């Protein structure tokens, strides 16, 4: 999957590869993808640290709400991998907060790891963990939640 499309200033084009089949999860993921793309534009257009920090903060706030919803689903449906999935949520939020702190401190090269953040999120969370959760939920009639 091509993460950064320089011509369109998009890191992540939304397509069926990213869809889990769960309406609410997919809607939340679309918002995250849009926020990541806004962050890509901010970095590419060198809009500055305030803009990057504001966008990362929006990503964190949306992700926290999304993760709370996922954790509620996991509890309601007794998802067997809840502990591992929740640990991944904690790791992703901590990673984003670390990037915010580095950017605010004007650490040299602080924007570089941020560029790879969406790839990590996609590869290790949406495409793997969230898809596994959605597959589990589809067997418990929870797809429309």
What are these regions (language model features)?
Residues 2-145:
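Small-residue-biased structural context
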């Amino acid at each position: 999957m091509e993460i950064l499309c320089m011509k369109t200033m998009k890191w992540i084009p939304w397509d069926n590869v990213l869809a889990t089949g769960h309406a609410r999860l997919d809607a939340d993921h679309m918002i995250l993808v849009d926020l990541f793309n806004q962050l890509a534009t901010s970095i590419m257009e060198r809009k500055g640290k305030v803009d990057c920090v504001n966008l990362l903060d929006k990503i964190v706030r949306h992700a926290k709400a999304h993760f709370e919803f996922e954790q509620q689903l996991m509890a309601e449906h007794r998802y067997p991998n809840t502990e591992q999935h929740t640990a991944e949520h904690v790791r992703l939020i901590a990673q984003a907060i670390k990037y915010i702190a580095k950017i605010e401190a004007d650490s040299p090269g602080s924007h570089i790891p941020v560029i790879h953040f969406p790839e990590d999120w996609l590869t290790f969370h949406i495409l793997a963990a969230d898809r596994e959760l959605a597959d589990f939920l589809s067997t418990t009639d929870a797809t429309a939640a």
